[in-house]
Amino acid sequence: MWKVWLLFDPRRTLVALFTFLFVLALLIHFILLSTDRFNWMQGAPTAPAQTS
């Protein structure tokens, strides 16, 4: 396993990994925000009150 770090620079590899994970997290959150069920910013749509 230690020979892998001889091929790749650890600093650049970790920066690339964390950048990829951050972009992936943003993408997942924006996809969830675009749905009605998981949009926590606007809240669930409320049903109109029924009077009888």
Curated annotation (Swiss-Prot):
Record field: transmembrane: 13-33
Record keywords: Antenna complex, Bacteriochlorophyll, Cell inner membrane, Cell membrane, Chlorophyll, Chromophore, Light-harvesting polypeptide, Magnesium, Membrane, Metal-binding, Transmembrane, Transmembrane helix
Superkingdom of origin: Bacteria
Residues the entry annotates as binding a bacteriochlorophyll: H29
GO molecular function list: bacteriochlorophyll binding; electron transporter, transferring electrons within the cyclic electron transport pathway of photosynthesis activity; metal ion binding
Subcellular location: Cell inner membrane
Any one Gene Ontology cellular component term annotated for this protein: plasma membrane light-harvesting complex
InterPro entries recorded: Antenna_a/b (IPR000066), Antenna_alpha (IPR018332), Antenna_alpha_CS (IPR002361), Light-harvesting_complex (IPR035889)
BP terms from Gene Ontology: photosynthesis, light reaction
Cytoplasmic side stretches: 1-12
Entry membrane topology: Single-pass type II membrane protein
Segments on the Periplasmic side according to the record's topology features: 34-52
UniProt key word Ion transport: no
Pfam families listed in its UniProt record: LHC
Keyword NADP: no
Family stated for the protein in its record: Belongs to the antenna complex alpha subunit family.
Annotated function: Antenna complexes are light-harvesting systems, which transfer the excitation energy to the reaction centers.
Subunit structure: The core complex is formed by different alpha and beta chains, binding bacteriochlorophyll molecules, and arranged most probably in tetrameric structures disposed around the reaction center. The non-pigmented gamma chains may constitute additional components.
Name the record gives this protein: Light-harvesting protein B-880 alpha chain
Gene source species: Afifella marina (Rhodobium marinum)
